[in-house]
């Protein structure tokens, strides 16, 4: 079998390394709209060869790991697929992606979301073990072909991932809360510090707490604007919920109600029981 990867950044590049190690494919082809990324992917050994998008779709399995707008555009440009071909997208919100797939090609698609990543981006950020022991969510697979589902499962089990099934509505709501909103909070924290006159001095004394919470603010703005744009309403709902919790904390502090502030914090501690 041949595999093709469109988008050779952190996710696509790491996938290339993992697929090479898996031994499932005789060759792995890649494509990226950024010419430098194409050259870096070859130099770093992420893929065997870089070709153009139309050649990628001659592969048995095609992985699309571009920003969401790019995924939708690529899907709309597909004219035809062979009966057994498998197309996998890595989009981090799903409803708009799934709605863009033509009915006559739907069986070829398995839409999934690997729940892993780092704040780094581009081919140089690729990690061979990025996917190992992580969760991958298979979304709305009841409309995918049986052969496509089985092959997708085989691939990601081989990569050491744990498979969870979910519908697109639940996925997009959950992803907004545990993935998308934390990035926005991290950007907000970073901007709060950067607007101070002596931001560099403040950061110089930062401990683990600040570094942990601000880490996500190093993520690609271009990629995250795409994610937010395509999951806007779920993210706004999550931010509204978070805002209410902040307002609650502000009220407790303003009123010197430290007993209930501690109870508020103790309630948050319960998260440890399910993590």
Which role does the model predict for each range below?
Residues 1-53, 61:
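NAD(P)+-binding Rossmann beta1-loop-alpha1 motif at the extreme N-terminus of oxidoreductases
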Residues 2, 27, 108, 135, ...:
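Residues at the starts of beta-strands that form the adenosine-phosphate
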Residues 24, 44-46, 83, 104-105, ...:
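Short, structured coil segments at secondary-structure junctions
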Residues 33-34, 66, 90-92:
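Short beta->alpha hinge that forms the Motif I/post-I loop of the SAM-binding pocket
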Residues 54-88:
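Rossmann-like NAD(P)-binding element
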Residues 74-124:
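Rossmann-like NAD(P)(H) cofactor-binding subdomain of soluble oxidoreductases
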Residues 128-215:
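Internal alpha-helical scaffold of NAD(P)-dependent oxidoreductase catalytic cores
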Residues 199-268:
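Interdomain hinge/lid region at the active-site interface
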């Amino acid at each position: 079998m041949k595999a093709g990867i469109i988008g050779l950044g952190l996710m696509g590049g790491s996938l290339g390394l993992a697929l090479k190690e898996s031994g499932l494919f005789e060759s792995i082809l890649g494509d990226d709209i950024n010419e430098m990324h194409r050259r870096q992917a070859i130099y770093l050994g992420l893929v065997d060869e870089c070709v153009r998008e139309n050649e990628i779709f001659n592969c048995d399995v095609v992985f699309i790991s571009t920003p969401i707008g790019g995924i939708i555009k690529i899907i709309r440009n597909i004219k035809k697929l062979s009966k057994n071909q498998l197309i996998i997208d890595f989009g981090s919100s799903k409803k708009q992606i799934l709605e863009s797939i033509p009915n006559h090609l739907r069986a070829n698609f398995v839409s999934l979301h690997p729940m892993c990543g780092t704040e780094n981006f581009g081919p140089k950020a690729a990690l061979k073990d990025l996917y190992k022991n992580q969760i991958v969510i298979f979304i709305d697979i009841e409309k995918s072909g049986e052969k496509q589902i089985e092959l997708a499962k085989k691939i990601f089990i081989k990569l050491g991932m744990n498979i969870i099934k979910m519908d697109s509505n639940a996925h997009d709501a959950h992803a907004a809360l545990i993935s998308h909103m934390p990035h926005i909070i991290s950007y907000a924290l970073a901007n709060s510090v950067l607007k101070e006159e002596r931001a560099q001095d403040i950061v110089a004394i930062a401990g683990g707490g600040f570094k942990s919470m601000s880490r996500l603010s190093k993520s690609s703005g271009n990629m995250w604007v795409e994610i937010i744009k395509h999951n806007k309403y779920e993210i706004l709902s999550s931010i509204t919920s978070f805002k209410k919790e902040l307002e609650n904390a502000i009220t407790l502090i303003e009123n010197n109600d430290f007993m209930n502030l501690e109870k508020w914090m103790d309630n948050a501690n319960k998260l440890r029981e399910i993590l």
